[in-house]
Amino acid sequence: MSVLVDIQHVSKKYKEAPRAAVSDLSLIINKGDIFGLLGPNGAGKTTFISMLCGLFPTTSGEIYINGHTHKTHSKESKQAIGVVPQEIALYPKLTAWENLMFLGHMYGLKGQSLKDNIKYNLSVLGLEANMHQKIISYSGGMKRRVNLIAGLLHNPQLLILDEPTVGVDVQSKQAIIEHLKKLNKENGMTILYTSHHLDEAEDFCTHIAIIDEGKLVTQGQTEALIRENNCNSIQEVYLKITGNQFRDK
C-alpha cells in the first residue's frame, strides 16, 4: 500500500498545561484508508488534526504528507487536504448555494465544474430542494451536511473530519456516512475521521487508532484489532487494553 500520512513520534505541549495534549504519537495512514482516530473528549484528537493541517507546529516529532515534511510540503500537498471542522464554518445569512460558491471561489475554483460539483453533492445529501434557503433556517443536521460539502469542493486526496456526526439527527448521520463510503469506494478518497463514538466508527472505519490523554492506546485494522484481542467490539478492545470503560470526559 502507498503511504499518504506518516506520523513519527509527534508531541504537542501547550504552555501552562499540566501534561502534553499529544504525547509521542506515531501512526501511518495509507491511501484509500478510512482511518478512525478515536478517544474521549480531551484525548487530543483535535490537537492532532490541527497539527496535521498545519494550523500550528508540533513540539517534537515529524509529520509527512505524500513524503513531504510538515514544514516543507508543497502548496499542492496542502491543497490535497480537505477539512470538515467540528464547528459549523458557514455564513448564516447566505444560502447554502451562496456559501458553497463563495468557498469554491476562495479555493480558486470556478465555472460549470464548480456548479456541477455543488449540485451533485447537494443532491446526494438530500439538500437540493433547500439550496436557496439561508443557512440560518437550516437544522443542525442540514448544516453539518453543507459543512461536509464545503470540505469536498476541491476533491481532496485526504478528507479530515472532526466529529462530523455530533449532535445530528439519524437521517443526517446516515446520509453523511453513506456519502463518505461512496467517495472512498468510487474515488479512492482517504478519510481521517475523529470521534468518541466507538460503535459508529467500528462500522465505518477500515482502520482505527484509539488515543487517551494524548497517548496511543492501540491501532490497527478494525477487524484485526477485534479478532486479535478476542473481543466482539472495539468497545471491548478498549476495556481489555486499558481496564476502563470508554468514557466521554
Task: Describe each PLM feature range.
Residues 101, 105, 112-130:
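Conserved ABC ATPase "signature" region
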Residues 155:
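Conserved catalytic motifs of ABC-family nucleotide-binding domains
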Residues 219-220:
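ABC ATPase "signature
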Residues 174-186:
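Helical segment within the ABC ATPase nucleotide-binding domain
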Residues 159-163:
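Catalytic Walker B motif of ABC-type/P-loop ATPase nucleotide-binding domains
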